[in-house]
């Protein structure tokens, strides 16, 4: 147990048998007003906002699966989702982590049961998958190690469902400074990986960055990466604009 004497964030390092692990830890203040003001006014709003999408129904994602963690769960089960991005297939698990991909200790929920990711993608019949994973690994594991596990997941999906198009979404920043720096480094690895392999790369994270590179207070519900309704609406707009750009 760690006892906080004041609000803020720090790092904890543990070592055992020659192995060292470091993680970021935050302690938020009690009220929402205190939380909103803790990091100062420069953290209130994002540096960029997406343009207003063109009106009309969006069906681009109706044949897509969305692979992710609890943040993706927020996206897919928020009121207004169908009007914003249609009816994608949810392939997620709360607290999802790519660390559990190589040994199948982490799988996704599909049709009310636990499936290996690649088998769920193949069985779902989707033509494309949108993937945002890695946030729960960063802060515990390095961007490079997280990326290696991400590649393993993609390799398995391509082997099992080679016809499916891969869309990689950049991972959202955190309210924690060190984790946001790790996330930025991880996103750069994903961006280059997508370019090298002709995958699609969807720039989501840049619309969720305050001037200090962290998640804006107005978008963060918990000081990390879980979203407020305002943040979810922003993500909807990013995806709507992306769909419209692909259909032009």
Write out the residue ranges for each language-model feature:
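Charged helix-capping and loop-helix junction motifs
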Residues: 144-153, 182-187
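Extracytoplasmic soluble-region selector
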Residues: 1-38
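N-terminal secretory targeting modules
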Residues: 25-67, 71-77, 246-247
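Conserved SGNH/GDSL esterase-like catalytic core that processes O-acyl groups on lipids
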Residues: 54-145
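A structural signal for isolated positions on well-ordered beta-strands in alpha/beta enzyme cores
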Residues: 65, 130, 165-167, 200
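Catalytic His-Asp segment of secreted/periplasmic serine-dependent ester chemistry enzymes
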Residues: 174-248
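Active-site segments of SGNH/GDSL-like serine hydrolases
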Residues: 155-185
């Amino acid at each position: 147990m760690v006892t906080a004497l004041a609000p803020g964030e720090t790092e904890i390092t543990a070592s055992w048998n020659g192995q060292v692990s470091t993680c970021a830890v935050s302690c938020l203040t009690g009220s929402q007003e205190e939380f909103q003001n803790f990091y100062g006014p420069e953290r209130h709003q994002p540096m960029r906002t997406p343009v207003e999408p063109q009106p009309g129904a969006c069906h681009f994602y109706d044949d897509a699966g969305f692979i992710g963690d609890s943040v993706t769960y927020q996206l897919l089960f928020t009121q207004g989702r169908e009007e914003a991005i249609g009816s994608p297939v949810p392939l997620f698990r709360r607290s999802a982590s790519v660390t559990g991909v190589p040994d199948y200790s982490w799988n996704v929920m599909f049709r009310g049961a636990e499936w290996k990711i690649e088998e769920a993608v193949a069985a779902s019949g989707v033509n494309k998958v949108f993937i945002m994973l890695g946030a729960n690994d960063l802060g515990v594991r390095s961007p490079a190690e997280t990326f290696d596990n991400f590649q393993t997941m993609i390799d398995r999906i391509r082997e099992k469902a080679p016809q499916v198009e891969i869309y990689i979404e950049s991972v959202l920043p955190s309210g924690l400074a060190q984790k946001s720096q790790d996330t930025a480094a991880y996103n750069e690895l994903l961006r280059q990986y997508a370019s090298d392999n002709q995958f699609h790369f969807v720039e989501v994270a840049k619309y969720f960055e305050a001037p200090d590179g962290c998640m804006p207070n107005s978008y963060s519900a918990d000081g990390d990466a879980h979203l407020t309704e305002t943040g979810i609406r922003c993500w909807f707009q990013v995806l709507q604009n992306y769909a419209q750009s692909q259909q032009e």
